């Protein structure tokens, strides 16, 4: 039977009851600045460390294998090795590419999977390269043969309103790096770069594909407040830095309105900020009562939150836990049993029911 969930934009209710007492947390292995992860199979998880290593972890034996690679990366501020996806015997990775003279870009590379050595070739570079250690994004998701990616605005603000530049946008390309012929540039947005799917984002560090409605969703960091969760929408504009999404500059000065007509409206906003990170629309056995609900991870308050989309009058938010496993950078649902693995702090964690 098909399952549906309904996105609504009215009253927001937040449950104050923690669900953590029904959960257990097990540390699997220690890591260093882990950033992205992806299941290879039911027993192996591939993980990036921002500092430059790609590791293959056997979840049963807890053995860690370091995979060599040829990426021209630069660990600079928030940048380094970022997200990673395994799909059909290929590895896709987003990373901070060294473009020379401390200029870098959010780039995407692809390699045939190999447990010893990954030989990557770039399939995307965000241009122009920028001398900044901030706001790279960058999450990846594959839908059919389309690769979606988030490119942060590199702390450049209004560059997110310039569709002739990649920073501050959502990217959509084919998995071989070619350009889809139905991207916005070929559908009424002739001044847009051909890879751009949507503009006006700041620092989106969450991206997921829903198995229930087939839509792509993202989370985005605001400034001082104004984090949000919403849907990726072709040819639209989330408004940064015309809009402030309810937040302010770090100095306390106003950025702009929370929202106004002509811009994409998010599903949920957070003021003050929770520092939204990785997200997923849960589908699995272990927490079957969560199927179709969005799980939102947080860096700032180290929380896991659940957004429920099955009520016509409100969006309900539950805080599942806080301050259990450190700053949560990523989460993956086990493809067989539905248990959840987190990159929290400097470790890989398993969460399951008691």
Locations of regions flagged by a protein language model:
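Repeated scaffold domains used in trafficking and secretory/extracellular systems
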Residues: 328-330
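Residues in well-ordered beta-strands of folded domains
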Residues: 7, 109, 124, 230, ...
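Bacterial Sec-dependent signal peptides at the C-terminal "C-region" and cleavage site
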Residues: 12-22
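Sec-dependent N-terminal signal peptides
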Residues: 4-14
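Acidic, Gly/Ser/Thr-rich repeat motifs that build Ca2+-stabilized beta-propeller blades
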Residues: 20-157, 206-221, 272-310, 334-353
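Short, solvent-exposed aromatic-acidic interface loops
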Residues: 97, 124-129, 187-189, 246, ...
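Beta-propeller domain segments
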Residues: 79-81, 153-318, 326, 350
């Amino acid at each position: 039977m098909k399952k549906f969930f309904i996105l609504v934009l009215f009253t927001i209710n937040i449950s104050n009851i923690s669900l953590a007492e029904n959960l257990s947390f097990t540390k699997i292995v220690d890591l260093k600045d882990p950033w992205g992860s992806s299941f290879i199979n039911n027993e192996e998880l591939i993980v990036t460390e921002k500092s430059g290593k790609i590791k293959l972890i056997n979840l049963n034996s807890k053995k860690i294998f370091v995979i060599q690679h040829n990426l021209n990366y630069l660990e600079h501020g928030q940048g380094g090795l970022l997200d990673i996806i395994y799909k059909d015997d290929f590895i896709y990775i987003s990373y901070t590419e060294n473009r020379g003279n401390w200029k870098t870009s959010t780039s995407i590379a692809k390699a045939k999977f190999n447990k010893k050595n990954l030989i990557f070739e770039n399939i995307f570079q965000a241009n122009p390269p920028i001398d900044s250690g901030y706001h790279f994004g960058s999450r990846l998701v594959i839908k059919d043969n389309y690769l979606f990616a988030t490119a942060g605005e590199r702390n450049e603000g209004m560059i997110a309103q310039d569709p002739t530049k990649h920073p501050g946008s959502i990217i959509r390309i084919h998995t071989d790096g070619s350009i889809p012929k139905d991207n916005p540039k070929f559908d009424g947005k002739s001044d847009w770069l051909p890879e751009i799917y949507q503009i006006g984002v700041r620092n989106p560090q969450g991206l997921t594909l829903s198995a229930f409605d087939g839509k792509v969703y993202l989370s985005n960091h605001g400034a001082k407040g104004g984090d949000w969760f919403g849907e990726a929408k072709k040819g639209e504009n989330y408004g940064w830095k015309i809009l402030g999404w309810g937040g302010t500059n770090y100095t306390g000065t106003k950025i702009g309105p929370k929202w106004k007509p002509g811009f994409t409206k998010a599903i949920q906003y957070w003021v003050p900020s929770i520092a939204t990170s990785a997200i997923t629309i849960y589908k699995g056995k272990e927490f079957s009562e969560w199927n179709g609900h969005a799980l939102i991870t947080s860096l700032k308050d180290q929380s896991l939150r659940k957004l429920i989309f099955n009520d016509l009058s409100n969006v309900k938010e539950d805080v599942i836990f806080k301050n259990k496993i450190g700053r949560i950078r990523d989460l993956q649902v086990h493809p067989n049993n539905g248990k959840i693995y987190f990159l929290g702090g400097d470790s890989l964690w398993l969460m399951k029911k008691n």
